[in-house]
Amino acid sequence: MKIFSAFICLLPKGLQYAIGTLLGEIAWLLVPPKRKRLAIGQILFCNITDDPKEARRIAKASTTRFGRMIIDVLRYPEIKDGAYKDMVEFINREYLDDALENGRGAILAAVHSGNWELLGGVLASEGYPLISVAMKQNGDADKFINEYRRLMNQHVTYKTGVREMINELKKGAFLGLIMDQDPGDDGVLVPFFGYETLTAAGPAVLARMQDVPIIFVTIHYSPYSGKHEIEVHPPIYVERTDDKKRDIAVTTTLLNEFIEDYIRRYPEDWFWLHNRWKWTRRFYGEQIETPPDVYQ
C-alpha cells in the first residue's frame, strides 16, 4: 500500500480521484449480493425512501465513495505538512476552541459518515488533543493505517477500560468515539429510526462521570466547493440525577436523534453495508419490533 500511496502522490489531483472513482466502482462490484440486499433493505426500512431503485442508488453511492476516501488517506504524505488545509472548511469551530480553552476534556462523537479517517487526521493536525478510540483490526491493515495516522499527528488507542479513558479526560484530552455501529450486548436500548436499538452508551457514560460535553463533529464532501466540510455541532451535556440509567438512556436517545437526522440529511454518506440491528435482533427480536432480517 505504501508503494501505491507513493505512486498516487506523484499524480495530478484529477487523476488521483479518477482512480478513486474506479476503485469505488470495483468495490461495489465485489460486494456480495446478500450484503447489497442488507444495505438496500435497511435504507427502505429506515424510510429514507420507499423506492427500491433509489434505495439501490443510495446503497451503491455509500459504497463507491470509499474509493475517494482511500485516495484521501493515501495522499497523507502529500498533505501532512499543511496542504490538507486546502481540502477542508470548518463550520462552528468555536465549539472545539471553547472546549480546548476550558481544559477539562470532551467527548468528540462521530459517525461512519463521510471520510471519518480524514476528520481525525485534520483535527489532530490542527492541534486539538484528540485520542481516537478504535477497534483493533487485521495486523497488516492496522500497521499501515496507524503509520499513516501518525503522519497526521493522530494518536489512536484501542478500546480500553473506562478508567483509562477517564484519566485521559482529566488531562484535557478530546476522546474521539464513533458511536453509530452495533455495540453488541454492551449497548443500551433506545430508539433509532423508529426501532428500539442497542446503541453504544460509552459517550454518555463518560460524559456523565466527568461532567464534560459531548460534541458531534461531522464531515461531508461538498461537490460544489470541492472541499470536505467539517461541522462542529453544539455541545450536549448529560443531565445528572439520582437515576444514572435514566440519564444515560435520555442522553443516548438524544445522540441517536442527532445521528438519525444527519443520516437523513446525507444518506449517501453513511455506512449502510453495516448490519446495524444484528445484535438487537439476536437479543430482543422476539420481544420488540426490529427491521426484518434481510441479510440471508
What are these regions (language model features)?
Residues M1-A110, I145-Y148, N153, S222:
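Membrane-anchoring hydrophobic helices of lipid-metabolizing enzymes
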Residues A83-V88, A134, L151-T157, F192-G194, ...:
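Short, flexible loop segments at the rims of nucleotide/cofactor-binding pockets, characterized by
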Residues R35-L38, M135-G139, T197-A200:
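Active-site metal-coordination segments of metallo-dependent hydrolases
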Residues G14-L15, I71-D72, G120-G121, A141, ...:
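Short, flexible segments with low predicted structural confidence
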Residues N102-T160, D182-V188, Y221, S225:
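Catalytic core of membrane glycerolipid acyltransferases/transacylases, capturing the structured
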Residues V31, F45, T49, R56-K60, ...:
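Non-catalytic C-terminal accessory region of glycerolipid acyltransferases
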